[in-house]
């Protein structure tokens, strides 16, 4: 089932960025948050942003020029390269990462996203449609749910259930088009509390079911 497949995805930690980022990669929440980032960075609408998965993590960016050629950045999936780029920009400085071998990495795959199998993408698009505080709500609910999963308190699929529940609760409220920082922080705390309460209710329900 999906839970087993997602756990298998977690095994391959190419970037070595820690457990939280590993789970977000398995659930595609990292891509969901990148949809929101792209909207603000490039002033795009949700429908202008497509998502594909590149399992090998070799190509890190691509830019298509007006002659339909594509410029790409390729390297080993190693954060040391990214850090060296940030520290040295606009110059290139030597990193401690190994060189990329195109012989060893001769298979480059690109996979379309299925929103049914990966609800995180739909959550991101719904958050952009709702606007206002919803992206902050999405992020907060995910952080709590992932924390509970890492602590073996919930199953993987309940990450999605928790986020969906919290977003639906918030969707019934009024959102400001341009919320203040104070309002964003308040929504963040409220979403975290709603997530904890929802998970607690699931535990209570499961415990009651075990009695009968």
Q: What is each model feature region?
A:
Residues 1-7, 11, 203-212:
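Single conserved hydrophobic/aromatic residue that forms the stacking wall/gate
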Residues 4-8, 12-29:
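Conserved anion/nucleotide-ligand pocket segment
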Residues 24, 34, 45, 134, ...:
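Helix N-cap / loop-to-helix initiation motif
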Residues 31-34, 59:
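Internal, well-ordered alpha-helical segments in soluble enzyme and binding-protein domains
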Residues 40-141:
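C-terminal substrate-binding/catalytic lobe of Rossmann-fold NAD(P)-dependent dehydrogenases
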Residues 104-201:
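C-terminal helical cap and adjacent loop that interface with cofactors, partners, or active-site loops
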């Amino acid at each position: 089932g999906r839970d087993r497949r997602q756990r298998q995805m977690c095994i391959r930690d190419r970037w070595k960025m820690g457990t939280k980022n590993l789970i977000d990669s398995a659930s595609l929440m990292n891509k969901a948050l990148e949809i929101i980032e792209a909207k603000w960075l490039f002033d795009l609408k949700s429908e202008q942003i497509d998502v594909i998965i590149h399992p090998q993590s070799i190509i890190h960016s691509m830019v298509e020029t007006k002659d339909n050629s594509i410029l790409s950045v390729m390297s080993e999936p190693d954060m040391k390269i990214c850090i060296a780029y940030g520290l040295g920009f606009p110059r290139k400085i030597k990193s401690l990462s190994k060189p990329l071998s195109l012989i060893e990495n001769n298979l480059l795959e690109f996979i379309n996203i299925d929103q049914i199998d990966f609800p995180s993408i739909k959550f991101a698009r719904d958050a952009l449609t709702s606007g206002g505080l919803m992206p902050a709500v999405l992020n907060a609910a995910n952080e709590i749910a992932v924390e509970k999963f890492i602590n073996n308190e919930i199953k993987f699929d309940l990450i999605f259930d928790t986020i969906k529940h919290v977003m639906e609760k918030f969707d019934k409220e009024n959102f400001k088009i341009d919320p203040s920082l104070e309002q964003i922080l308040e929504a963040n705390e409220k979403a975290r509390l709603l997530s904890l309460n929802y998970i607690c209710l699931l535990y209570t329900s499961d415990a009651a079911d075990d009695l009968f």
